[in-house]
């Protein structure tokens, strides 16, 4: 065999062998791929939400329990007045009730009698009396308007002597200069009692009344029993007069 022939045969064998290797490689698997399976990998990220589907048909389940009542709503506006109802039947005539006040009247009369007795006892023990008149002196000095108010509260009046005996009684109970219930406030030198009646009995001190300063419109009883005109705003003792 010549050298050329040998070379040609070697080339043919090489080509056949290479083709055989190629086919064998295609029919076999790689070393890594043909080994045992590996572990599962981590889950991938969630995909995007799909489009909203159509509303399904109502289910066939049982109805749930009723929920708790809600809060009371605000009061509504007042309604229109209703129509007048029918007149009811006339009621029976009531019976008159008479209240017996006999016992109460008797008790009131007894209390009044007791008060009169107490008042008389006080007047007799703390005052001078002439007949049915009692004269009681205060220990405070005040102008005539307050003197009138004080005697009025005690159900009396400012003492006004009608005669010499009453004048002495007032002098004895006062024991100091005291107002008399006599003025000439309405008409100068026309002296009247506090009810507006002109006085008939007088007992002026010598030279009185002199109306010094044109403001002496009230009268006081001096300690000697004589009278003197003074301003009504001056303060003197008060003698109140009470009648039995």
Curated annotation (Swiss-Prot):
One GO biological process term: cell surface pattern recognition receptor signaling pathway
Disulfide bonds, paired cysteine numbers: 151-240, 218-232
Signal sequence interval, chain numbering: 1-18
4-hydroxyproline PTM positions: 43, 58, 69, 78, 81
Listed Low complexity bias regions: 65-74
Domain Collagen-like: 38-96
Domain C-type lectin: 129-241
UniProt cross-references to PANTHER family, sorted A to Z: MANNOSE-BINDING PROTEIN C (PTHR24024:SF34), PULMONARY SURFACTANT-ASSOCIATED PROTEIN A (PTHR24024)
Protein name: Mannose-binding protein C
Origin species: Rattus norvegicus
Lineage: Eukaryota, Metazoa, Chordata, Craniata, Vertebrata
């Amino acid at each position: 065999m010549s050298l050329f022939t040998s070379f040609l045969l070697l080339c043919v064998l090489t080509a056949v062998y290479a083709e055989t290797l190629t086919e064998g490689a295609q029919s076999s698997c790689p070393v890594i791929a043909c080994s045992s399976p590996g572990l599962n990998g981590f889950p991938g990220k969630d995909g995007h939400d799909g489009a909203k589907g159509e509303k399904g048909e109502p289910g066939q389940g049982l109805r749930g329990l009723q929920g708790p009542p809600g809060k009371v709503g605000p009061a509504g506006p007042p309604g229109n007045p209703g129509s007048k109802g029918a007149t009811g039947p006339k009621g029976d005539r009531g019976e008159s009730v008479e209240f017996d006040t006999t016992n109460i009247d008797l008790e009131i009369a007894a209390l009044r009698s007791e008060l009169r007795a107490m008042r008389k006892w006080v007047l007799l023990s703390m005052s001078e009396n002439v007949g049915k008149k009692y004269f009681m002196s205060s220990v405070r000095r005040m102008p005539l308007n307050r003197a009138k108010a004080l005697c009025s509260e005690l159900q009396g009046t400012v003492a006004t002597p009608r005669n010499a005996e009453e004048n002495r009684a007032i002098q004895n109970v006062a024991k100091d200069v005291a107002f008399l219930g006599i003025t000439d406030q309405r008409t100068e030198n026309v002296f009247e009692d506090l009810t507006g009646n002109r006085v008939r009995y007088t007992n002026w001190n010598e030279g009185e009344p002199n109306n010094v300063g044109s403001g002496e419109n009230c009268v006081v009883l001096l300690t000697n029993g004589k009278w003197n005109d003074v301003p009504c705003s001056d303060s003197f003792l008060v003698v109140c007069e009470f009648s039995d």
